[in-house]
Amino acid sequence: MKNRLLIMILLLLPMVAMSQVDTGARKRVMEEYRQQYRQQFNEYKDSISGQFIQYLKQRWDEKQLFQGEHQPVRPEPVLQPESDTLSDTLHSEQLPTGDMVTLQVEQFQPTTTDKVATYVAEVFNIAFYGKQLTFKVPVNVSKIKLSGSREYQISNYWQQLNKEKLNQVTLQLAGQKQELRLNGWGLFDLTRQLTASIYPNNADQQVALAVYLLNAMHYDVRMGCVGGNLVILMASASKIYDIPFTVVSNVRYYAFRPIGAKEELKGRLYTYSQQLDGANHGIDLFMSETPQLGGRLCSNPYKNRFGGRDITIYVNQGLMDFYAQYPQMELKMYANAAIDEVFYLALERNIKPLIEGKNTYRAVSTLLQYVQEGFGYQVDNLQFGREKNFFCEENFYYPANDCEDRALLFSYLVRMFVGVDVVLLEYADHVAAAVCFPKEAKVKGDYYLYRNNQYVVCDPTCKGAKVGQVSNKYKKQSPKIIQTA
């Protein structure tokens, strides 16, 4: 019952913070939360010092370590396709559809800021993607030594941690999560960076401390051991590509080494099956809001000229660095991600004037042409040596993009500045988009029927392709339809 009450309070905190409630009511909610959190952390410490510490000492189970699911590689053309092979005559034809892909996200807010209690602390300064952060950690924590990666050694280390005021550290971490608007992955990354700062020369100790802290914030992470090295096993509802994983109790756990570790994970994996009480929330990777990571803009802005206008757009360098290390996910996760507020204003200032005064069809046509002509084209394997989906802002940072990035960018521009619905069309070797025009627009062209509405095909990659034009090879395919927010 206590656990449920705490989680309900935690889930309500973001709404409380954003709503226009009176100060007195907000203080009462916060104080109730703080009392519950302190009590819950004490219960967490009790559970560790009791049965769970003893459980960690037992021999860990051997689990199969899968070598990561590779991100699908689309056999895209090396050169940007052009519309020479498309017919100039547009006919309205309903095309066959495949699966419908929607995004369902469970978000979890672990804690909020609290007044840090007085205690003897060691100060650690972290440069977190353009933000300078300071953490106060109980002075004894950095002195506690993990003597090895055996079960009893880890158990003894956790028992020593349990004597320290680490609830003050989790409060600081959770406070930064709120302040910087981090999602679960952002907090996971920040926790790893903090533990790397505390134990710069002991990778195993970084893992053991990170798992302790994340468990205390109710996240479902575990320790594993591969080839004598500890790893963090992170539960996530989102599919992550190219990261080794194991399965425990039908839950997929992705294996992460400490930051900076170079060793490839090889060998048998050993871990424990029992879940620590209350640590049952997977790490969410969905970007429901954009992290606030410093104000430094990149030194090399996107510049172009289109429609008689000079277009210059800067993006946040810290955000680009954050996205550069972000795990690769399914396309639907990018298609529905939030965008940076400053970046949105730059788009509004530079792109929106291109379509002012135009009807829906002409506005969509202009944006389609802009995306077709306004960016260099290069497939991911040539630009990065691997597959890489872009968040929207990354299109204005890297020198080139490919089909899925263009389709995603086009969908954002149409939704933001034209105000009509867009879906993505994921073919076996290509990604395009489709726009739901108002019925009175009477737009001709190939379309898909989705939720009883016609979505007219738009291909932002094929240079010169008009609204409603699609290559004959794709008319015979049934793409996945990815819903956008």
What do these predicted regions represent?
Residues K27, E31-L213:
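Long, contiguous, compositionally biased segments that the model treats as domain-scale units
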Residues Q205-K352:
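Extended, non-transmembrane interaction/recognition domains
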Residues V139-K143, S147-T191, M333-Y398, T461:
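Secondary-structure boundary elements
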Residues S19-R28:
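Cleaved targeting-peptide boundary
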Residues L10-M18:
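Hydrophobic h-region of N-terminal signal peptides that target proteins for export
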Residues V221-N250, I355-K358, D405-A485:
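Hydrophobic/aromatic-rich core segments of domains that either
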Residues S197-A210, Y219, Q378-P438:
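Active-site neighborhood of thiol-dependent amide/isopeptide-bond enzymes
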Residues K2-L10:
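Sec-dependent signal peptide recognition
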